[in-house]
Amino acid sequence: MKNKIAIALFSAALGFAGAAHAEDMVFTSWGGTTQDAQKASWAEGFTAETKINVTQDGPTDYGKIKAMVEAGNVNWDVVDVEGDYAVQAGKLGLLEKLDFSIIDKSKLDPRFVTDYSVGSFYYSFVIGCNKDAVKQCPKSWADVFDVKKFPGKRAFYKWSAPGVIEAALLADGVAADKLYPLDLDRAFKKLDTIKSDIIWWDSGAQSQQLLASAEAPFGSFWNGRLTALAATGVTVETSWTNNITAADSLVVPKGTKNKDAAMKFIAHATSDQAQASFATATGYAPINLDANVLMDGELRQTLPDMQAETQVNADMDYWAEHRDEIGTRWYAWQAQ
Amino acid sequence: MAMTATAEGMRRKRAFVGARGGSFGYLLPALVLVVIFFIVPVLMLLMRSVLEPEPGLQNYKALLGSTTYLRIFLNTFLVAGVVTIISIVIGYPVAWLLAIMPEKWSRLVLAIIILSMWTNLLTRTYAWMVLLQRTGVINKTLMGLGLIDQPLPLVNNLVGVTIGMTYIMLPFVILPLMGVIRAIDPAILRAAALCGATSMQCFTRVLLPLSLPGIAAGALMVFVMSLGYFVTPALLGGTSNMMLAELVAQFVQSLVNWGMGGAAAFVLLVVTLTLYAVQLRYFNPNKAR
């Protein structure tokens, strides 16, 4: 009897040691359908390949990243952040330098690669419209800002980020190649003209709810959320005229205890296969240049990188530099 | 019967006083917890507000010197005040009814009220969004009945925030009020009626003054909780009637400007503590009883 207990204890101890040995890491993103796809397309394959468990956490919170790094207690190993934040945070010393001996950057879209970050996926702010709810859908940003021709509420992204300011300037007649440096006075003046008709969305899920219920029958949306909404049977019309692109980035907060696993995860997530699978699931464009050939041709046509004709690339470096200044002004304007 | 109840009450009171006078030690675990996990972090936040980005009071100057931020402060008090008043007006009759209902029924109603408190806050707030929006159930019904021809703006504004927050705050008014009203001896009301008071006079001159401590306790609780509320105003309000907690979240999460965030949070804390002190001084429910 005693022996049996001893054996049980011994094997339990062994089991414990074994469990502790298997590596774990945490991936943090924005939740919702996007993170579901990241889990399915990136994390599951990664775990199968490397035996490293990936715990999902979220939503991404820049305050938390700063707190973790300053306290030296980093629980997030890889984080999906907005591109302009990645550039800024790298400069502020909040991020680990990426190990490009593990991550193959030769195949990655160079627009989104820095010492501290690589692209995660890239998306466009497009004009979305619930066709059943309005007589006619706006086709251009000027239309979206025209309350006479297109009465009713319109939806815009609430947070200070590339997208809305650019849309306002385009609507006011600024040429797409003359957007930067941003004329903030002009942009806010234009935004003033539709302010009382704006409903702000602060998450992708909310934007879908607004459009589907026709609470705001049109507005500016992430293209992938419209693809997902259309798949549920809502008659969505998407106008790609002057679609404004921005990318999310993958970063590693400084001081992570799982740096090696983090680099391997990024290498896997940005591989052609993982990127193709994520793009197929979400309607966002891959940042791996080899992912194209792995994707269904018809679906390929609906992704942001195929809509290059009148496309506007948000200038991430400009935003990184002026993020605080624009943000302070943005929120003050909203609150007025 | 009444005698035994009083004697029992006295015994309990002695035991309670004994414990309070006897050992401060019982308080220690809770106190340590509060100091480590609340007081220390708050002080650290305060330090940031005067040290970041450089030592000085510039964060407070920026906060209090800007009309935008002052508007947010005013709006915060406006919303908290309106929510408090409406909660009391709606909650008082409910509490009264609960206090005089047969126990069997009051338990059931109470269970319903408390059950709603246990449901996830976010779920409840989203539910209001679906009800109140322009294409929501309420507007559709009113339009279907021909009572209105344009949807009423019930959400993304002050109306939405007030409705959503009042609903969430109601139990915090009803529960203390019910306790106070129950403790009022019905004989006093009977006596008033016998002396010729109308039922209105019974209410305004007897019941209302006697239940004032309950109103004060409930009002303070609701007002203070409302001042720091985040989720409901963020989802049901518009940006032009932003509340302070949202401003703090913007500073901390989006702008990563902890100096300003700390300053805003600290101003809120000071105002809240001041109000609490005023309430203790003038409307202390324990003293009044």
Residue ranges of model-derived segments:
Chain A
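A bilobed periplasmic-binding-protein/Venus flytrap-type ligand-binding module shared by bacterial periplasmic
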Residues: V126-A133, L169-G173, A247-A261, I266, ...
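Extracytoplasmic ligand-binding site segments that recognize negatively charged/polar headgroups
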Residues: G32-A37, N75-W76, D80-A212
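Extracellular/periplasmic bilobal clamshell ligand-binding domains
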Residues: D296-Q336
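Mature extracytoplasmic/periplasmic domains
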Residues: P253-N313
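A ligand-binding cleft/hinge motif common to bilobed small-molecule-binding domains
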Residues: D84-G90, A212, P217-T235
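Early extracytoplasmic/lumenal segment of secretory-pathway proteins
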Residues: E23-A89
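Periplasmic-binding protein-like
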Residues: K105-L108, Y123-F125, D185-T193, A230-T256, ...
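Sec/Tat signal peptide C-region and signal peptidase I cleavage site
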Residues: F16-A22
